[in-house]
């Protein structure tokens, strides 16, 4: 048996992260990566969810650097049977903003820079009141935060569990189509992926309208792939 949560996120601030860069335009795709959701929901390196990692890879408020280390951080969720799918847009709109970065130093030595830091540009952001939907699959009951922060600007968003069910996975493998977003690395080792559409975005491109062979959970009329886990290598 697994607990399946259908969750929705409503933005209360503009959401920005650079899905793609077109010249000086930095565009935010109306998609929330499942890696980002794990961090935003507080599932990573958490005593509450029993996903703590070694001190070397610590990802808490007081740590040497708050840099995501996806493999040690996310694979810690696998023993607890916690998996989050990417978030798809239910309704959204976008806004364009122009920004400029200025250096106000009185004295500047003209040295070759080691980092490519843009000085101006435009951002295409997801507007407030936009809504996203995702699923959480867990082997035990979870209590989620009602408010989270997302994106480069740490935008405020409300989380709501719209529906939850306790389900058994299908007894046998069968062909089915999952129309929403999936992380291919997390599903390809437990299912035979036959066809899909690609959504290009870092750090791992996502897929949707996926036809596959494998086991699933039947949530209302939707078949959600079972046995998904965070994978980063073919061991």
Language-model features, listed with the residues they occupy:
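Short N-terminal binding/cap micro-motifs at the start of the first secondary-structure element
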Residues: 15-21
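Extended, compositionally biased
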Residues: 29-142
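A short, structural micro-pattern
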Residues: 1-3, 128
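Short amphipathic
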Residues: 3-13
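Beta-strand elements of well-folded, non-transmembrane domains
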Residues: 11-15, 138-140
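Short acidic, gly/pro-rich beta-turn/loop elements at beta-sheet edges
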Residues: 19, 51, 144-146
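Basic polyanion-binding and macromolecular-assembly surfaces
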Residues: 129-235
